[in-house]
């Protein structure tokens, strides 16, 4: 399953909407995704599954790239 993760690049950084970034990652569950990203110094704001029409919409975006961690 593919998940979209909204995060700040620095865990010590205060969450500011304008600095929020996102990435796509494959995982079994939200917990699995968080474990995969635990070694990164990210402040993870939100993790959501991307399926169905939402996945098709995101894949149509030129920025869509699934990260392998």
UniProtKB/Swiss-Prot annotation:
<dbReference type="GO" id="GO:0003677">
    <property type="term" value="F:DNA binding"/>
</dbReference>
<dbReference type="GO" id="GO:0003899">
    <property type="term" value="F:DNA-directed RNA polymerase activity"/>
</dbReference>
<keyword id="KW-0808">Transferase</keyword>
<dbReference type="Pfam" id="PF07288">
    <property type="entry name" value="RpoY"/>
</dbReference>
<keyword id="KW-0240">DNA-directed RNA polymerase</keyword>
<keyword id="KW-0548">Nucleotidyltransferase</keyword>
<dbReference type="InterPro" id="IPR009907">
    <property type="entry name" value="RpoY"/>
</dbReference>
<comment type="subunit">
    <text>RNAP is composed of a core of 2 alpha, a beta and a beta' subunit. The core is associated with a delta subunit, and at least one of epsilon or omega. When a sigma factor is associated with the core the holoenzyme is formed, which can initiate transcription.</text>
</comment>
<dbReference type="GO" id="GO:0006351">
    <property type="term" value="P:DNA-templated transcription"/>
</dbReference>
<protein>
    <recommendedName>
        <fullName>DNA-directed RNA polymerase subunit epsilon</fullName>
        <ecNumber>2.7.7.6</ecNumber>
    </recommendedName>
</protein>
<comment type="function">
    <text>A non-essential component of RNA polymerase (RNAP).</text>
</comment>
<keyword id="KW-0804">Transcription</keyword>
<dbReference type="GO" id="GO:0000428">
    <property type="term" value="C:DNA-directed RNA polymerase complex"/>
</dbReference>
<comment type="similarity">
    <text>Belongs to the RNA polymerase subunit epsilon family.</text>
</comment>
């Amino acid at each position: 399953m593919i998940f979209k993760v909204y995060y700040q690049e620095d865990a010590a950084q205060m969450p500011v909407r304008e600095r929020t970034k996102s990435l796509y990652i494959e995982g079994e569950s939200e917990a699995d995704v968080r474990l995969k990203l635990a070694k990164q110094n990210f402040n993870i704001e939100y993790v959501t599954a991307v399926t169905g029409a939402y996945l098709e919409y995101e894949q149509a975006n030129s920025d869509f790239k699934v990260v392998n961690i």
